[in-house]
Amino acid sequence: MAVQQNKKSPSKRGMHRAHNALVVPGIAVESTTGETHLRHHISPNGFYRGRQVLKTKSEA
């Protein structure tokens, strides 16, 4: 079983955990339709940055 050789100081412990923070996902609002979607992703109705890039099933 692995056992530490020396005690890790509170400073080193904090530096070790520096990248463990939870991050809230970036939510964007589509300017044309007002729908919310993840940043850099297409909105559910096929719009990206104000332009329609995919046709939905109802439009096809």
Curated annotation (Swiss-Prot):
Region described as Disordered: spans on this chain = 1-21
Q: According to its record, what are the GO cellular component terms?
A: large ribosomal subunit
From the UniProt record, which GO molecular function terms apply? structural constituent of ribosome
For bias type Basic residues, the affected ranges are 9-19
Keyword line: Ribonucleoprotein, Ribosomal protein
Q: Which InterPro entries match?
A: Ribosomal_bL32, Ribosomal_bL32_bact, Ribosomal_zn-bd
Q: Name one Pfam family in it.
A: Ribosomal_L32p
BP-aspect Gene Ontology terms: translation
Family statement drawn from the similarity comment of this UniProt entry? Belongs to the bacterial ribosomal protein bL32 family.
Q: What is this protein called?
A: Large ribosomal subunit protein bL32
Q: Which organism is it from?
A: Albidiferax ferrireducens (strain ATCC BAA-621 / DSM 15236 / T118)
Q: What is the lineage of its organism?
A: Bacteria, Pseudomonadati, Pseudomonadota, Betaproteobacteria, Burkholderiales
